[in-house]
Amino acid sequence: MRFAHTWTTCSVRSTRDVTPAIREIVLRPEGTGIENYPIGSHVTIGVLIDGRPETRCYSLVGDFSPDGYRIAVRRAPDSRGGSRYMWTLKPGARVEVSSPASLLEIDWSRSSYCLIAGGIGITPIFGIAAALMRRNADVRLHYAVKSRDDAAFLDELSELLGDRLIVHAGDEGQRIDLDDTFAGLPPDAATIICGPMRLLEAARRRWAAAARPPTDLRYETFGSSGLLPTASFRVRIENSGREIMVPDNRSMLDALNEAGYEVMSDCQRGECGVCAIDVVAVDGQIDHRDVFFSDHQKQTNRKICPCVSRAVGAITVNTLYLNDISRS
């Protein structure tokens, strides 16, 4: 396992709405301090969904602070319930929180950096921008939002970056032009992006079209976004006769584990590929929401990351191990 989580009880220190739909929550560990953590880290938080204990991952906002873990949660009407639960938390509430972890490796030696954030994807990008500014790096942050009213932390970012912050507000007709953005970068520039799947996929295609090294484009993800609407779907287990329904508010990974199938997982963000399983048939369409597989691999529909990816209709999978308790 890549992450060896240490869990601690945290209390909610404060909450504030940074936009009408995004709430900042500061969590303070009880009885212990906060150790320094890498820029771009996230924490896993224990939540209750319809009375069931589950977990959700949230990126840490801004720089390291000894005062607490700072996260931002978008209220999502079509979410699986995590954001709804987090929005019920008041100062003094207690939750279980993992130690911070990061899959994002940043090369701090580049001469130029392009940061791109889409919507709530600003949460990990904020801290990266602050770290680069401290290093006097050549950095530009492109912030794509529906409107300026929907732009979380806009005042703080403006103060930090000045004219290095470029806001692309959709309602003002200022959509980001990825071809133009990438064409203006020096040859050794690194780009780091976090946003919805459509933005990530578009960036990957335009980056390749610009003949830039794939390793110079790095991602931070949030798994709730997809190319298709979130709906319930069916998973058939090859040669077993079993069919498992995945509700619209549950992940495929959770549904398989609850049905007794042991599916290994790690990041649960669609980044590491540990949970990937084989797909042998598709009766409908797969909505690949990971950034682990390449575009070509996704088009073949031979594997799926069940932690974030979904389907419309039904899929048949194999190579799953049914634990002894479920067999009895």
Give the positions of each predicted feature.
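Ferredoxin-reductase
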Residues: R2-R94, W108, V145-S147
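FNR/FR-type flavoprotein reductase catalytic core
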Residues: F3, G81-G241, M245
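Short, surface-exposed secondary-structure boundary micro-motifs
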Residues: L48, P100-A101, V280
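Local cysteine-cluster metal-coordination motifs and their immediate loop/turn environment
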Residues: P124, Y261-G284, H288, H296-G313
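Short flanking/linker segments adjacent to small metal-binding domains or redox-active Cys/His motifs
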Residues: D171-G173, P247, S309-S328
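C-terminal accessory/binding modules appended to enzymatic or scaffolding proteins
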Residues: F233-M264
